[in-house]
Protein backbone atom coordinates (compact mmCIF):
# COMPACT_ATOMS: atom_id res chain seq x y z
CA UNK A 1 0.00 0.00 0.00
CA UNK A 2 2.79 2.37 0.96
CA UNK A 3 4.70 1.45 -2.19
CA UNK A 4 1.63 2.17 -4.34
CA UNK A 5 1.13 5.52 -2.63
CA UNK A 6 4.79 6.38 -3.11
CA UNK A 7 4.64 5.55 -6.82
CA UNK A 8 1.46 7.61 -7.24
CA UNK A 9 3.14 10.56 -5.53
CA UNK A 10 6.22 10.17 -7.73
CA UNK A 11 4.12 10.08 -10.90
CA UNK A 12 2.06 13.05 -9.73
CA UNK A 13 5.18 15.09 -8.98
CA UNK A 14 6.71 14.22 -12.33
CA UNK A 15 3.42 14.97 -14.04
CA UNK A 16 3.36 18.37 -12.38
CA UNK A 17 6.73 19.23 -13.86
CA UNK A 18 5.48 18.12 -17.27
CA UNK A 19 2.29 20.16 -17.09
CA UNK A 20 4.21 23.32 -16.33
CA UNK A 21 6.20 22.82 -19.53
CA UNK A 22 3.25 22.18 -21.84
CA UNK A 23 0.69 24.43 -23.48
CA UNK A 24 -2.94 23.74 -22.60
CA UNK A 25 -5.43 22.86 -25.29
CA UNK A 26 -7.43 20.03 -26.80
CA UNK A 27 -6.93 18.68 -30.32
CA UNK A 28 -10.06 17.59 -32.20
CA UNK A 29 -8.10 15.20 -34.37
CA UNK A 30 -4.75 14.44 -32.70
CA UNK A 31 -1.77 13.85 -34.94
CA UNK A 32 1.78 12.77 -34.43
CA UNK A 33 3.82 15.91 -34.54
CA UNK A 34 6.09 18.29 -32.69
CA UNK A 35 3.79 18.44 -29.64
CA UNK A 36 3.94 14.69 -29.08
CA UNK A 37 7.71 14.77 -29.45
CA UNK A 38 8.00 17.68 -27.04
CA UNK A 39 5.82 15.97 -24.44
CA UNK A 40 7.85 12.79 -24.38
CA UNK A 41 11.09 14.73 -24.52
CA UNK A 42 10.10 16.53 -21.34
CA UNK A 43 8.97 13.25 -19.78
CA UNK A 44 12.30 11.62 -20.44
CA UNK A 45 14.77 14.37 -19.77
CA UNK A 46 12.88 17.23 -18.16
CA UNK A 47 14.04 19.50 -20.93
CA UNK A 48 11.68 18.77 -23.88
CA UNK A 49 12.90 18.83 -27.43
CA UNK A 50 16.07 20.63 -26.43
CA UNK A 51 17.61 17.34 -25.29
CA UNK A 52 18.86 16.31 -28.73
CA UNK A 53 20.29 19.75 -29.46
CA UNK A 54 21.88 19.98 -26.04
CA UNK A 55 23.54 16.59 -26.36
CA UNK A 56 25.26 17.67 -29.56
CA UNK A 57 26.60 20.81 -27.87
CA UNK A 58 27.77 18.81 -24.87
CA UNK A 59 29.62 16.39 -27.11
CA UNK A 60 31.32 19.29 -28.87
CA UNK A 61 32.41 20.82 -25.58
CA UNK A 62 33.90 17.51 -24.46
CA UNK A 63 35.90 17.30 -27.64
CA UNK A 64 34.53 13.86 -28.44
CA UNK A 65 34.90 12.61 -31.96
CA UNK A 66 31.57 12.23 -33.70
CA UNK A 67 30.54 10.80 -37.01
CA UNK A 68 27.40 11.37 -39.02
CA UNK A 69 25.21 8.31 -38.96
CA UNK A 70 23.50 9.39 -42.14
CA UNK A 71 26.69 9.02 -44.17
CA UNK A 72 26.99 5.41 -43.07
CA UNK A 73 23.50 4.05 -43.44
CA UNK A 74 21.16 6.37 -45.35
CA UNK A 75 22.17 4.85 -48.66
CA UNK A 76 21.13 1.20 -48.15
CA UNK A 77 18.66 1.79 -45.29
CA UNK A 78 15.64 1.17 -47.53
CA UNK A 79 16.91 -2.39 -48.02
CA UNK A 80 16.95 -3.11 -44.29
CA UNK A 81 14.07 -4.48 -42.25
CA UNK A 82 11.78 -2.07 -40.45
CA UNK A 83 13.36 -2.96 -37.12
CA UNK A 84 16.90 -2.38 -38.43
CA UNK A 85 15.85 0.96 -39.88
CA UNK A 86 14.36 2.00 -36.53
CA UNK A 87 17.50 0.90 -34.70
CA UNK A 88 19.75 2.87 -37.04
CA UNK A 89 17.58 5.98 -36.79
CA UNK A 90 17.69 6.10 -33.00
CA UNK A 91 21.16 4.72 -32.22
CA UNK A 92 23.58 7.38 -31.02
CA UNK A 93 26.80 5.42 -30.36
CA UNK A 94 29.33 3.73 -32.66
CA UNK A 95 32.28 1.51 -31.84
CA UNK A 96 34.48 -0.34 -34.32
CA UNK A 97 31.92 -0.02 -37.13
CA UNK A 98 28.97 -1.27 -35.03
CA UNK A 99 26.12 0.96 -33.89
CA UNK A 100 24.66 0.92 -30.38
CA UNK A 101 21.80 2.53 -28.49
CA UNK A 102 21.80 4.11 -25.08
CA UNK A 103 18.92 3.24 -22.71
CA UNK A 104 17.43 6.64 -23.53
CA UNK A 105 17.65 5.88 -27.25
CA UNK A 106 15.74 2.65 -26.69
CA UNK A 107 12.93 4.39 -24.83
CA UNK A 108 12.65 6.98 -27.60
CA UNK A 109 12.60 4.21 -30.24
CA UNK A 110 9.52 2.55 -28.74
CA UNK A 111 7.70 5.85 -28.24
CA UNK A 112 8.22 7.47 -31.67
CA UNK A 113 8.25 6.37 -35.29
CA UNK A 114 11.17 8.54 -36.28
CA UNK A 115 13.70 11.06 -35.03
CA UNK A 116 12.64 14.56 -36.02
CA UNK A 117 16.16 15.96 -35.62
CA UNK A 118 18.88 13.33 -35.95
CA UNK A 119 21.94 14.14 -33.86
CA UNK A 120 25.47 13.09 -34.65
CA UNK A 121 26.53 9.61 -33.62
CA UNK A 122 29.20 9.59 -30.94
CA UNK A 123 32.19 7.40 -31.77
CA UNK A 124 33.55 5.62 -28.71
CA UNK A 125 36.79 3.85 -27.92
CA UNK A 126 36.66 0.70 -25.78
CA UNK A 127 37.75 2.72 -22.74
CA UNK A 128 34.85 5.13 -23.32
CA UNK A 129 32.40 2.22 -23.29
CA UNK A 130 33.82 0.93 -20.02
CA UNK A 131 33.30 4.38 -18.52
CA UNK A 132 29.72 4.49 -19.82
CA UNK A 133 28.95 1.11 -18.23
CA UNK A 134 30.62 1.90 -14.90
CA UNK A 135 27.43 2.81 -13.05
CA UNK A 136 25.17 -0.02 -14.17
CA UNK A 137 25.79 -2.41 -11.28
CA UNK A 138 24.95 0.30 -8.74
CA UNK A 139 21.81 1.50 -10.56
CA UNK A 140 18.39 0.67 -9.15
CA UNK A 141 17.00 -2.44 -10.83
CA UNK A 142 13.33 -1.47 -10.67
CA UNK A 143 10.84 -0.04 -13.14
CA UNK A 144 12.89 3.14 -13.67
CA UNK A 145 16.11 1.32 -14.64
CA UNK A 146 16.36 2.66 -18.21
CA UNK A 147 15.28 6.16 -17.21
CA UNK A 148 17.80 6.26 -14.39
CA UNK A 149 20.62 5.18 -16.72
CA UNK A 150 19.73 7.71 -19.42
CA UNK A 151 22.76 7.81 -21.76
CA UNK A 152 24.92 5.70 -19.41
CA UNK A 153 24.54 2.39 -21.20
CA UNK A 154 25.15 0.42 -24.39
CA UNK A 155 22.53 -1.70 -26.20
CA UNK A 156 23.46 -3.81 -29.22
CA UNK A 157 21.13 -4.58 -32.13
CA UNK A 158 20.62 -8.17 -30.90
CA UNK A 159 19.61 -6.83 -27.50
CA UNK A 160 17.33 -4.28 -29.15
CA UNK A 161 15.40 -7.09 -30.87
CA UNK A 162 15.30 -9.00 -27.60
CA UNK A 163 13.92 -6.01 -25.68
CA UNK A 164 11.28 -5.35 -28.34
CA UNK A 165 10.10 -8.95 -28.11
CA UNK A 166 9.88 -8.71 -24.32
CA UNK A 167 7.38 -5.87 -24.77
CA UNK A 168 5.05 -7.94 -26.97
CA UNK A 169 5.03 -11.46 -25.52
CA UNK A 170 3.71 -13.07 -22.30
CA UNK A 171 6.09 -14.45 -19.67
CA UNK A 172 5.24 -18.12 -20.23
CA UNK A 173 7.21 -18.51 -23.45
CA UNK A 174 10.32 -16.94 -21.94
CA UNK A 175 10.24 -19.50 -19.13
CA UNK A 176 10.06 -22.36 -21.64
CA UNK A 177 13.09 -21.09 -23.56
CA UNK A 178 14.96 -20.40 -20.31
CA UNK A 179 14.38 -23.93 -19.01
CA UNK A 180 15.45 -25.49 -22.32
CA UNK A 181 18.87 -23.85 -21.98
CA UNK A 182 19.18 -24.69 -18.29
CA UNK A 183 21.08 -27.98 -18.63
CA UNK A 184 21.65 -28.22 -14.85
CA UNK A 185 17.97 -27.84 -13.94
CA UNK A 186 18.64 -25.09 -11.36
CA UNK A 187 16.88 -22.33 -13.36
CA UNK A 188 20.18 -20.49 -13.79
CA UNK A 189 22.06 -19.76 -17.00
CA UNK A 190 25.50 -18.40 -17.83
CA UNK A 191 26.37 -15.50 -20.09
CA UNK A 192 26.94 -17.61 -23.23
CA UNK A 193 23.58 -19.31 -22.70
CA UNK A 194 21.91 -15.92 -22.34
CA UNK A 195 23.25 -14.93 -25.76
CA UNK A 196 21.46 -18.00 -27.16
CA UNK A 197 18.32 -17.09 -25.22
CA UNK A 198 18.25 -13.65 -26.86
CA UNK A 199 18.47 -15.20 -30.31
CA UNK A 200 15.81 -17.81 -29.52
CA UNK A 201 13.27 -15.31 -28.22
CA UNK A 202 13.99 -12.84 -31.03
CA UNK A 203 13.88 -15.55 -33.73
CA UNK A 204 10.18 -15.14 -34.50
CA UNK A 205 9.33 -11.72 -33.14
CA UNK A 206 6.82 -10.43 -35.69
CA UNK A 207 9.13 -7.59 -36.80
CA UNK A 208 9.47 -8.75 -40.37
CA UNK A 209 11.40 -7.24 -43.25
CA UNK A 210 10.06 -4.79 -45.77
CA UNK A 211 8.79 -6.42 -48.95
CA UNK A 212 9.56 -4.81 -52.28
CA UNK A 213 8.51 -5.62 -55.85
CA UNK A 214 11.76 -7.45 -56.50
CA UNK A 215 12.79 -9.32 -53.40
CA UNK A 216 12.71 -9.39 -49.63
CA UNK A 217 15.89 -8.06 -48.12
CA UNK A 218 17.12 -9.78 -45.00
CA UNK A 219 19.08 -8.27 -42.18
CA UNK A 220 22.79 -8.95 -42.34
CA UNK A 221 24.08 -11.60 -39.96
CA UNK A 222 23.86 -10.25 -36.44
CA UNK A 223 27.32 -10.03 -34.95
CA UNK A 224 28.06 -10.53 -31.29
CA UNK A 225 29.12 -7.24 -29.70
CA UNK A 226 32.85 -7.02 -29.20
CA UNK A 227 32.33 -5.07 -25.98
CA UNK A 228 30.31 -5.41 -22.80
CA UNK A 229 26.74 -4.18 -23.01
CA UNK A 230 24.17 -2.95 -20.51
CA UNK A 231 22.31 -6.25 -20.21
CA UNK A 232 25.47 -8.34 -19.97
CA UNK A 233 26.88 -6.22 -17.14
CA UNK A 234 23.48 -6.01 -15.44
CA UNK A 235 22.97 -9.79 -15.41
CA UNK A 236 26.50 -11.24 -15.31
CA UNK A 237 28.87 -8.56 -14.01
CA UNK A 238 31.75 -6.87 -15.85
CA UNK A 239 33.74 -10.09 -16.19
CA UNK A 240 30.75 -12.34 -16.88
CA UNK A 241 31.35 -14.37 -13.72
CA UNK A 242 27.77 -14.30 -12.39
CA UNK A 243 24.81 -16.50 -13.32
CA UNK A 244 21.29 -15.33 -14.11
CA UNK A 245 18.38 -16.89 -12.21
CA UNK A 246 14.99 -17.06 -13.92
CA UNK A 247 13.29 -15.15 -11.09
CA UNK A 248 15.67 -12.24 -11.62
CA UNK A 249 15.10 -12.37 -15.37
CA UNK A 250 11.32 -12.38 -14.92
CA UNK A 251 11.55 -9.35 -12.62
CA UNK A 252 13.56 -7.59 -15.33
CA UNK A 253 10.88 -8.41 -17.92
CA UNK A 254 8.09 -7.16 -15.67
CA UNK A 255 10.00 -3.99 -14.79
CA UNK A 256 10.76 -3.20 -18.44
CA UNK A 257 7.12 -3.64 -19.43
CA UNK A 258 6.04 -1.44 -16.51
CA UNK A 259 8.61 1.24 -17.35
CA UNK A 260 7.53 1.53 -20.98
CA UNK A 261 3.87 1.55 -19.97
CA UNK A 262 4.49 4.40 -17.53
CA UNK A 263 6.46 6.33 -20.14
CA UNK A 264 3.70 5.99 -22.73
CA UNK A 265 1.03 6.86 -20.19
CA UNK A 266 2.83 10.09 -19.29
CA UNK A 267 3.47 10.83 -22.96
CA UNK A 268 -0.20 10.61 -23.98
CA UNK A 269 -1.74 11.91 -20.75
CA UNK A 270 0.40 15.03 -21.21
CA UNK A 271 1.99 14.45 -17.81
CA UNK A 272 -1.24 14.02 -15.84
CA UNK A 273 -1.93 11.09 -13.52
CA UNK A 274 -5.00 10.16 -15.58
CA UNK A 275 -5.51 9.75 -19.33
CA UNK A 276 -8.53 11.23 -21.06
CA UNK A 277 -10.34 8.73 -23.25
CA UNK A 278 -9.45 10.73 -26.35
CA UNK A 279 -5.79 10.50 -25.25
CA UNK A 280 -6.22 6.73 -24.92
CA UNK A 281 -7.60 6.65 -28.47
CA UNK A 282 -4.59 8.65 -29.67
CA UNK A 283 -2.28 6.09 -28.02
CA UNK A 284 -4.17 3.21 -29.65
CA UNK A 285 -4.08 4.73 -33.13
CA UNK A 286 -0.61 6.29 -33.00
CA UNK A 287 1.10 3.75 -35.29
CA UNK A 288 -2.01 3.02 -37.38
CA UNK A 289 -2.59 4.04 -40.99
CA UNK A 290 -5.83 2.12 -41.60
CA UNK A 291 -8.34 3.57 -44.04
CA UNK A 292 -10.94 3.57 -41.25
CA UNK A 293 -8.93 5.88 -39.02
CA UNK A 294 -11.25 8.81 -39.76
CA UNK A 295 -14.22 6.70 -38.66
CA UNK A 296 -12.48 5.87 -35.40
CA UNK A 297 -11.84 9.54 -34.70
CA UNK A 298 -15.45 10.38 -35.55
CA UNK A 299 -16.51 7.77 -32.98
CA UNK A 300 -14.18 9.38 -30.44
CA UNK A 301 -15.76 12.80 -31.01
CA UNK A 302 -19.37 11.62 -31.11
CA UNK A 303 -19.51 8.69 -28.67
CA UNK A 304 -17.03 9.49 -25.90
CA UNK A 305 -18.16 11.97 -23.26
CA UNK A 306 -15.96 14.91 -22.37
CA UNK A 307 -14.18 14.51 -19.04
CA UNK A 308 -14.11 10.70 -18.94
CA UNK A 309 -10.70 9.19 -18.28
CA UNK A 310 -8.56 6.03 -17.98
CA UNK A 311 -6.46 5.40 -14.87
CA UNK A 312 -2.86 4.20 -14.91
CA UNK A 313 -3.91 0.82 -13.50
CA UNK A 314 -6.53 0.42 -16.24
CA UNK A 315 -3.94 1.35 -18.85
CA UNK A 316 -1.50 -1.25 -17.48
CA UNK A 317 -4.19 -3.94 -17.49
CA UNK A 318 -4.91 -3.18 -21.16
CA UNK A 319 -1.19 -3.39 -21.99
CA UNK A 320 -1.07 -6.77 -20.22
CA UNK A 321 -3.94 -7.89 -22.45
CA UNK A 322 -2.03 -6.84 -25.58
CA UNK A 323 0.85 -9.22 -24.74
CA UNK A 324 -1.65 -12.09 -25.18
CA UNK A 325 -2.97 -11.09 -28.60
CA UNK A 326 -2.18 -14.48 -30.18
CA UNK A 327 -4.31 -16.28 -27.60
CA UNK A 328 -7.04 -13.66 -27.93
CA UNK A 329 -7.00 -14.03 -31.74
CA UNK A 330 -7.63 -17.77 -31.37
CA UNK A 331 -10.65 -17.03 -29.16
CA UNK A 332 -11.92 -14.56 -31.77
CA UNK A 333 -11.67 -17.15 -34.56
CA UNK A 334 -14.87 -18.72 -33.23
CA UNK A 335 -16.76 -15.59 -34.23
CA UNK A 336 -14.88 -15.13 -37.51
CA UNK A 337 -15.66 -18.66 -38.73
CA UNK A 338 -19.31 -18.27 -37.77
CA UNK A 339 -19.46 -14.77 -39.33
CA UNK A 340 -20.85 -13.48 -36.05
CA UNK A 341 -20.33 -9.99 -34.64
CA UNK A 342 -18.63 -9.70 -31.26
CA UNK A 343 -20.69 -8.18 -28.49
CA UNK A 344 -19.40 -6.72 -25.25
CA UNK A 345 -20.07 -9.76 -23.02
CA UNK A 346 -18.41 -12.11 -25.51
CA UNK A 347 -15.38 -9.86 -25.87
CA UNK A 348 -15.02 -9.64 -22.10
CA UNK A 349 -15.12 -13.44 -21.80
CA UNK A 350 -12.52 -13.87 -24.57
CA UNK A 351 -10.15 -11.46 -22.78
CA UNK A 352 -10.54 -13.42 -19.54
CA UNK A 353 -9.82 -16.71 -21.33
CA UNK A 354 -6.72 -15.33 -23.09
CA UNK A 355 -5.14 -13.47 -20.16
CA UNK A 356 -6.70 -14.84 -16.99
CA UNK A 357 -7.63 -11.28 -16.05
CA UNK A 358 -10.55 -8.96 -16.71
CA UNK A 359 -10.61 -5.50 -18.22
CA UNK A 360 -12.71 -2.87 -16.48
CA UNK A 361 -16.13 -2.02 -17.87
CA UNK A 362 -14.83 1.52 -18.39
CA UNK A 363 -12.06 0.25 -20.71
CA UNK A 364 -14.31 -2.20 -22.55
CA UNK A 365 -16.92 0.47 -23.18
CA UNK A 366 -14.25 2.80 -24.56
CA UNK A 367 -12.80 0.18 -26.91
CA UNK A 368 -16.23 -0.80 -28.23
CA UNK A 369 -17.27 2.77 -28.91
CA UNK A 370 -14.04 3.47 -30.83
CA UNK A 371 -14.04 0.28 -32.95
CA UNK A 372 -17.77 0.06 -33.73
CA UNK A 373 -17.58 0.77 -37.46
CA UNK A 374 -21.23 0.00 -38.26
CA UNK A 375 -22.98 1.55 -35.28
CA UNK A 376 -24.42 -1.82 -34.21
CA UNK A 377 -22.71 -1.86 -30.79
CA UNK A 378 -20.48 -4.73 -31.93
CA UNK A 379 -16.71 -4.85 -32.29
CA UNK A 380 -15.02 -4.96 -35.70
CA UNK A 381 -12.56 -7.43 -34.20
CA UNK A 382 -10.49 -8.19 -37.33
CA UNK A 383 -9.28 -4.65 -37.80
CA UNK A 384 -9.15 -4.14 -34.03
CA UNK A 385 -6.51 -6.89 -33.82
CA UNK A 386 -4.53 -5.31 -36.65
CA UNK A 387 -4.55 -1.93 -34.92
CA UNK A 388 -3.40 -3.49 -31.64
CA UNK A 389 -0.59 -5.45 -33.28
CA UNK A 390 0.70 -2.30 -34.95
CA UNK A 391 0.44 -0.45 -31.64
CA UNK A 392 2.34 -3.03 -29.60
CA UNK A 393 4.97 -3.59 -32.30
CA UNK A 394 5.46 0.18 -32.56
CA UNK A 395 4.66 0.26 -36.28
CA UNK A 396 7.17 -2.52 -37.06
CA UNK A 397 4.64 -5.30 -37.55
CA UNK A 398 4.03 -6.78 -41.01
CA UNK A 399 0.93 -8.95 -41.37
CA UNK A 400 1.77 -12.63 -41.64
CA UNK A 401 -0.01 -15.95 -41.39
CA UNK A 402 1.53 -17.43 -38.28
CA UNK A 403 -0.29 -18.92 -35.32
CA UNK A 404 0.84 -18.83 -31.73
CA UNK A 405 1.49 -22.58 -31.95
CA UNK A 406 3.88 -21.98 -34.86
CA UNK A 407 5.68 -19.29 -32.90
CA UNK A 408 6.34 -21.51 -29.89
CA UNK A 409 7.19 -24.42 -32.19
CA UNK A 410 9.97 -22.27 -33.63
CA UNK A 411 11.06 -21.26 -30.11
CA UNK A 412 11.23 -24.94 -29.13
CA UNK A 413 13.23 -25.79 -32.25
CA UNK A 414 15.77 -23.04 -31.60
CA UNK A 415 15.94 -23.98 -27.91
CA UNK A 416 16.81 -27.57 -28.78
CA UNK A 417 19.64 -26.28 -30.96
CA UNK A 418 20.92 -24.29 -28.00
CA UNK A 419 20.69 -27.34 -25.71
CA UNK A 420 22.67 -29.47 -28.14
CA UNK A 421 25.40 -26.85 -28.36
CA UNK A 422 25.49 -26.49 -24.58
CA UNK A 423 25.88 -30.25 -24.14
CA UNK A 424 28.69 -30.37 -26.70
CA UNK A 425 30.58 -27.66 -24.87
CA UNK A 426 29.97 -29.26 -21.49
CA UNK A 427 30.71 -32.89 -22.34
CA UNK A 428 33.07 -32.56 -25.26
CA UNK A 429 30.54 -34.10 -27.61
CA UNK A 430 26.80 -34.03 -27.61
CA UNK A 431 24.58 -36.98 -26.70
CA UNK A 432 22.40 -36.19 -29.70
Swiss-Prot record:
Domain EF-hand, chain residue ranges per copy: 169-204, 224-259, 290-325, 359-394
Gene3D superfamilies xrefs: EF-hand (1.10.238.10)
Location, primary (coarse class): mitochondrion
Binding positions (Ca(2+) 1): 182, 184, 186, 188, 190, 193
Modified residues (Phosphoserine): 202
Keyword presence, Transcription regulation: no
Compartment(s) of residence: Mitochondrion intermembrane space; Mitochondrion inner membrane
Similarity remark: Belongs to the MICU1 family. MICU2 subfamily.
Known function: Calcium sensor of the mitochondrial calcium uniporter (MCU) channel, which senses calcium level via its EF-hand domains. MICU1 and MICU2 form a disulfide-linked heterodimer that stimulates and inhibits MCU activity, depending on the concentration of calcium. At low calcium levels, MICU1 occludes the pore of the MCU channel, preventing mitochondrial calcium uptake.
Protein name listed in UniProt: Calcium uptake protein 2, mitochondrial
Species the sequence originates in: Rattus norvegicus (Rat)
Lineage: Eukaryota, Metazoa, Chordata, Craniata, Vertebrata
Amino acid sequence: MAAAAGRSAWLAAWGGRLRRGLAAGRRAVPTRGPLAAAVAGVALAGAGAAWHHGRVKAAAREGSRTVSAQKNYLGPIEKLSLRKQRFMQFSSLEHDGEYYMTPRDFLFSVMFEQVERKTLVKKLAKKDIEDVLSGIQTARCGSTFFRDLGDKGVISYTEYLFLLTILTKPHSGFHVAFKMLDVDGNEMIERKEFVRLQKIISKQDGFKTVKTNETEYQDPTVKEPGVNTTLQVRFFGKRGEKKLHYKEFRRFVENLQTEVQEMEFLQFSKGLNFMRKEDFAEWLLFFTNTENKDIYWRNVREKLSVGESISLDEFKSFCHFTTHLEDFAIAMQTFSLAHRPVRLAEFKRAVKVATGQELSDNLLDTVFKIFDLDGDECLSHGEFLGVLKNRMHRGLWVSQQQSVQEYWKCVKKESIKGVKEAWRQQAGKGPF
